[in-house]
From Swiss-Prot:
It is found in: Cytoplasm, Cytosol. SUPFAM superfamilies: P-loop containing nucleoside triphosphate hydrolases. Catalyzes the reversible ATP-dependent phosphorylation of mevalonate 5-phosphate to produce mevalonate diphosphate and ADP, a key step in the mevalonic acid mediated biosynthesis of isopentenyl diphosphate and other polyisoprenoid metabolites. Its EC number is 2.7.4.2. It catalyses: (R)-5-phosphomevalonate + ATP = (R)-5-diphosphomevalonate + ADP. The gene is Pmvk. This is Phosphomevalonate kinase. ATP binds at K17, R18, K19, S20, G21, K22, D23, R141, H171, Q180.
Length: 192
């Protein structure tokens, strides 16, 4: 059930592998749409905040792309999975509390349970977006395969999801990416 007061016109659920460019794409869309129209939501935000609180860590440092975050990533994944097993909608509910903008971009959807929660809560306004990048492109962005991370559900949970409503190819061709974003922006603006 959707939290009270939350009635978005469109919720885009973004997913993709580490270093595929999910944050880059969603930040770009938000900058074009504006903060009064578009909310950028991260499921990892409340997860990292709660994990930092329970483990006495620096929450702000867990938010950046630092080695600090990478040091705790594997344990944080296991901890988050335990929370989700107890309550699959725990982190989903947290990120939508108090959001008033009509367009929501969820930048880090990682599991079918995340998608199911949003579909049950918001129905027809949900669109799934997969950001894909070649392994070579991801490596150029600093990705290195990490056992226990890149083969965990947090990275592979949507590999066999089926058909996404949108697929954004982010292999490093700026014009190709721009064309895809323009198409998606047209769809979003039609919902306003």
């Amino acid at each position: 059930m959707a939290p009270l007061g939350a009635s978005p016109r469109l919720v885009l659920l973004f997913s993709g592998k580490r270093k595929s460019g999910k944050d880059f794409v969603t930040e770009r869309l938000k900058s074009r749409l504006g903060g009064n129209i578009c909310a950028l939501l991260r499921l990892s935000g409340p997860l990292k905040e709660e994990y930092a609180r329970e483990h006495g860590l620096d929450f702000q440092r867990l938010l950046d792309a630092s080695t600090y975050k990478e040091t705790y990533r594997r344990d944080m994944i296991c901890w988050g999975e335990q929370k989700r097993q107890a309550d699959p909608g725990f982190f989903c509910r947290k990120i939508v509390e108090g959001v008033s903008q009509p367009i929501w971009l969820v930048s880090d959807t990682r599991r079918t349970s995340d998608i199911q929660w949003f579909q049950e809560a918001y129905g027809a306004v949900i669109q799934t977006v997969r950001v894909v990048a070649s392994e070579q492109s991801r490596q150029q962005r600093g990705w290195v395969f990490t056992p226990g991370v890149d083969d965990a559900e947090s990275e592979c949970g949507l590999d066999n999801f089926g058909n996404f409503d949108w697929v954004i190819e982010n292999h490093g061709d700026e014009q190709c990416l721009e064309d895809q974003l323009e198409h998606l922006l047209g769809f979003i603006q039609a919902k306003l």
